[in-house]
A protein has these predicted regions:
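A short loop-to-beta-strand structural motif that recurs across blades of beta-propeller domains
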Residues: 34-37, 78-81, 122-125
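Beta-propeller fold detector
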Residues: 3-7, 46-50, 91-95
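Conserved beta-strand positions in repeat-built beta-propeller and related beta-rich domains
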Residues: 25-31, 68-75, 115-119
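Residue-level signal for WD-repeat beta-propeller blades
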Residues: 19, 29, 39, 62-63, ...
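A generic "binding-loop/recognition-motif" signal
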Residues: 10, 31, 41, 54, ...
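Beta-rich, blade/repeat-based domains predominating
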Residues: 9-24, 53-66, 71, 98-110
Length: 130
């Protein structure tokens, strides 16, 4: 069976998703510049404006150690954003080479993040402090 959830805003365009260990779904809302949270058990949805604003175009996203990490692809340079799930606070860092639209991110087995910098012919490793 396929179950679909309609997001709260008709202009939402989720590009990528990340799933936490407790099966909560987070999505990068590319068109509106938001991070969204969907609880598939209850259908509850909550959204936060991305730090880079409505034109930040969140794209690649992953979960690591109690936080959602994603990239804002329309900022120059692209930024890496971290959203702490307990405090609901954001942190951001500029991507040194610019990012070039990070469309995909993954968590490594040793607790770091790998990003595909698709317009720059680069792959980046983000070493996450413990």
């Amino acid at each position: 069976a396929i179950h679909e959830w309609t997001l709260p805003h008709p202009e939402s365009r989720p590009r990528r998703i990340a799933i936490t260990p407790d099966d909560i779904i987070y999505y990068a809302d590319y068109s509106r510049g938001y991070l969204g949270r969907l609880d598939p058990k209850t259908g509850a949805i909550k959204e936060w404006p991305s730090p880079g604003g409505p034109k930040s175009q969140p794209y690649g996203i992953t979960y690591l150690n109690g936080a959602i990490w994603y990239c804002e692809s329309n900022l120059k340079p692209n930024t890496l954003a971290r959203f702490d799930l307990k405090t609901e606070k954001f942190q951001t860092w500029a991507i040194p080479a610019g990012g070039g639209v990070v469309r995909n991110m993954m968590t490594t087995k040793d607790g770091n993040i790998v990003m595909a910098e698709s317009a720059l012919n680069m792959v980046a490793l983000v070493t996450v402090g413990k």
